Amino acid sequence: MAQVQYYGTGRRKSSVARVRLVPGEGRVIINGRDFENYIPFAALREVVKQPLVATETLGNYDVLVNVNGGGYTGQAGAIRHGISRALLKADPEYRLTLKRAGLLTRDARMKERKKYGLKGARRAPQFSKR
């Protein structure tokens, strides 16, 4: 018999994560690798686990993720967003918990573009009085 799966897509900066939740024992697989090996920073691993901790479903689902684009922080944020959306499909009662934790909101902050005449987005060239 076909196994029940819940899908969610998460985005952050230039990263896109396609997340599948499958009832299991709590493994997190990102791009075919265990997430302890994929994400090198403990703080970002905690970011990925936030939706599961908030809804108290940490050992209930295996999380299978395909993520591309961006760096570690963007990918971790995209995975968190995707897991939150998939959990919402699994059980709509999680909406209030996830919403209060701010996990359903797409983080719209992006890198500001560099402007001409400036060294960076806002940094001006050094000013000389004489």
UniProtKB/Swiss-Prot annotation:
Q: Which domain of life is it from?
A: Bacteria
**What's a Gene Ontology MF term here?**
RNA binding
What intrachain disulfides are recorded?
none
**GO BP terms:** translation
Q: Which UniProt keywords apply?
A: Ribonucleoprotein, Ribosomal protein
One GO cellular component term: cytosolic small ribosomal subunit
Q: Which family does it belong to?
A: Belongs to the universal ribosomal protein uS9 family.
Name the PANTHER family on file. Answer: RIBOSOMAL PROTEIN S9, SMALL RIBOSOMAL SUBUNIT PROTEIN US9M
The name this protein goes by in its record: Small ribosomal subunit protein uS9
